[in-house]
Regions:
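Secretory-pathway/membrane protein signature
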Residues: 1-253
Length: 253
């Protein structure tokens, strides 16, 4: 049955119910950081509703690190920023050579990009071992079929709320998320490529281009360093969003 085939009265009833319950959860249980008491209390509230139409509901406990997923943005931004600035100071005071400075920046940026890819692209729990674990809960409900089981349908949502993303919060009219993330990630990629070329140019004759890369490519790293400031400011861990769209809508859908 297509969505357009549902009677408008049924659609309105469900929309009104969803809006009412989402508002109720936000007002009654407040900030729902992953694994905290508010989140668990809200799950118990959902369980009471699910008990009315499910054949069975249960909680499953597990260990998780609430800040591990996005706290890497703080770590990566600080380390890359400090590496670029510190190496620049050490290089221009002749404490280290330009080649060593490029090698350090190249290695640090590579590690930063690797962590970003593992966490943000592949959703691997790469940084979790570095963070404190707490007990959290999954809530599951089951509706049994009338006949033979031929296919299982899994519907999921999450009732916890995300930390505030400043790029989105302050970018309602200007696409700050796209601008700053392009600057941050794009700058890091370009810095890595330039540092590799500059390192190679120290050992392979690349003519005027190689000389230019050796002498001037480090200047671009400062653009990357400034981009890391925006990455550091990306997540506000002191503010938890209401979580209406992400993801109470999915929970009540």
């Amino acid at each position: 049955m297509k969505f357009s085939d549902f009677p408008q009265a049924v659609i309105k009833e469900n929309v009104d119910y969803t809006v009412k319950e989402i508002t109720n959860v936000i007002k009654k249980y407040g900030p729902r950081e992953s694994g905290n008491e508010n989140c668990y209390a809200a799950q118990k509230h959902i369980k009471k509703e699910m008990d009315t139409f499910c054949d069975g509901t249960e909680f499953e406990s597990y260990k998780m690190a609430p800040k591990a997923f996005l706290h890497f943005t703080k770590l990566v931004s600080v380390v890359i920023f400090l590496a670029i600035v510190a190496c620049a100071i050490l290089m221009y005071t002749s404490i280290i050579t330009p080649l060593l400075a490029q090698c350090i920046v190249c290695g640090v940026v590579f590690v930063g990009l690797f962590i970003t890819v593992m966490e943000f692209l592949f959703y691997k729990q790469f940084m979790d071992p570095l963070y404190k674990k707490i007990e959290a809960h999954n809530l599951m409900g089951v509706r049994k079929p009338r006949g033979e089981v031929k296919r299982r349908i899994v519907i999921s949502g999450h009732i916890d709320a995300a930390y505030e993303w400043r790029h989105l919060y302050y970018g309602k009219k200007v696409p700050l998320m796209a601008i700053f993330m392009s600057w941050t990630i794009g700058g890091a990629i370009v810095s890595f490529i330039l540092s590799v070329i500059a390192i190679v140019a120290n050992f392979v004759d690349m003519g005027t281009f190689g000389d230019f890369m050796i002498n001037y490519s480090y200047i671009f790293h400062f653009v990357t360093a400034l981009g890391m400031v925006t990455l550091f400011m990306f997540v506000d861990f002191n503010t938890i969003s209401p979580g209406a769209n992400d993801n109470l809508t999915g929970t009540y859908a």
